[in-house]
Regions:
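Substrate-binding/active-site clefts of carbohydrate-active enzymes
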Residues: 3-16, 22-32, 39-47, 54-148
Length: 148
């Protein structure tokens, strides 16, 4: 069996993609402050805004669940946007679900598309979905969530 990748659509081949990690993007680091930057991003020629995960990050402080980069960083901050706790709600650090809807609508009004980066392959150690689906993670013999 051979696999062939689909060709990218023409609009994508011609697009300018601008990646936004909210925390350092503006002094406020919020969706509201990023919303105010939309006209500027449009003037830059961005067609697609690639938004790093704005959803609720896991705040579990157990170091065994931190990435190597988090452990080496002097900030001692468990919050990592790629270690999510809640895939359905915006992290209060960045704003609200309504702020996200407003950001996307504002981008669309200016003719820009939005890619929302969400990683489903891994999450933090205390995701809200575990209450409903405890079998969604690998556990050790004692029933603790395994890392890695």
């Amino acid at each position: 069996m051979s696999c062939t990748a689909k060709s990218a659509p023409d609009f994508l081949k011609k697009s300018v993609i601008y990646q936004i990690f909210l925390r350092p993007f503006t002094p406020g680091g919020t969706l509201q402050s990023a919303f105010r930057m939309l006209p500027y991003l449009s003037e830059l020629g961005a067609d697609i805004l690639y938004l790093c995960p704005p959803m609720v990050a896991d705040d579990d402080v157990r170091l065994e669940f931190w990435s190597d980069r988090q452990k080496k960083c002097a900030l001692n901050n468990p919050m990592n946007p790629y270690r999510l706790k809640d895939y359905y709600n915006v992290d209060p650090e960045y704003g609200t679900n309504e702020d996200l809807k407003k950001f996307v609508a504002g981008a669309h009004e200016l003719g820009m598309r939005v890619i929302l980066d969400l990683v489903y392959y891994h999450c933090g150690p205390t995701p809200v979905f575990l209450k409903e689906h405890p079998d969604f993670v690998v556990r050790d013999a004692e029933g603790r969530v395994k890392n890695g």
